[in-house]
């Protein structure tokens, strides 16, 4: 999630940091509602959904946009994918009722690895076409988990045979028995990542100079250390909330 470049684009770091803080607040509220039983209708309703979607859309689009700025995309992708596997292992061992299969880190790592592997082919696509097609395919495949795809004239029902296993769930076709508290399959989210990737090439490196300025350095620090902070934030928040709720209930 970090930009690996000597002359950093600080505004991108700060945008990532702001989005990460929003994610931390969202996850903190998730703990309050689902682990500590404090009902919040707005959070479980449409406002909470819009908040969650705004976080992941920015995070994934920005990750795709920033990928061409970094070095060693295969190594970076492997690290992020490994971090996703770590999250799965930890939740499976310690929070099996809230296990994470194919969460956002697994998605980002997979997208980085696939994009790095396909980069010679993707670079042949005109950037404007790439942005438009990626956005269209994101819209088409957005309801994959619900059993259909969007089409201009209506919906295309997908064969239920596709929704067969955890392997198909990784792609976006999750069976009814599948459960994950954080689920970001390749479909549709890879296309949002690619929209960011092509948007970077559409803008062009020469027009990114304004993004080097800084507006809020603390947000930049948060953005530069986003992977570590992401891995640590939920245990820390959960610990703080556990102590806080015990004190409140004891009093």
Language-model features, listed with the residues they occupy:
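Alpha-helical transmembrane segments and their immediate juxtamembrane cytosolic regions
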Residues: 1-251
């Amino acid at each position: 999630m970090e930009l690996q470049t000597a002359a950093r684009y600080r505004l991108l770091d700060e945008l990532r940091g702001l989005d990460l803080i929003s994610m931390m607040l969202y996850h903190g509220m998730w703990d309050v509602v689902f682990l500590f039983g404090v009902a919040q209708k707005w959070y479980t309703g449409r406002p909470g959904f819009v908040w969650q979607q705004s976080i992941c859309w920015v995070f994934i689009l920005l990750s795709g946009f920033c990928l061409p700025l970094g070095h060693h995309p295969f190594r970076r992708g492997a690290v992020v994918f490994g971090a996703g596997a770590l999250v799965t292992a930890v939740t499976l061992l310690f929070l099996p009722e809230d296990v994470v299969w194919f969460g956002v880190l697994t998605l980002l790592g997979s997208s980085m690895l696939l994009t790095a592997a396909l980069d010679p082919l993707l670079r042949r696509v005109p950037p404007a076409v790439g942005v438009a097609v990626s956005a269209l395919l994101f819209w088409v495949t957005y309801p994959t988990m619900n059993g259909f795809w969007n089409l201009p004239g209506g919906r295309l029902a997908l064969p239920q045979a596709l929704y067969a296993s955890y392997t198909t769930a990784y792609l976006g076709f999750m069976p009814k028995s599948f459960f994950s508290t954080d689920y970001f399959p390749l479909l549709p989210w890879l296309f949002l990542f690619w929209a960011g990737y092509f948007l970077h090439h559409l803008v062009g490196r020469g027009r990114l100079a304004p993004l080097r300025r800084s507006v809020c350095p603390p947000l930049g620090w948060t953005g530069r250390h986003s992977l570590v902070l992401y891995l640590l934030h939920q245990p820390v928040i959960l610990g703080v909330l556990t102590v806080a709720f015990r004190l409140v209930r004891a009093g």
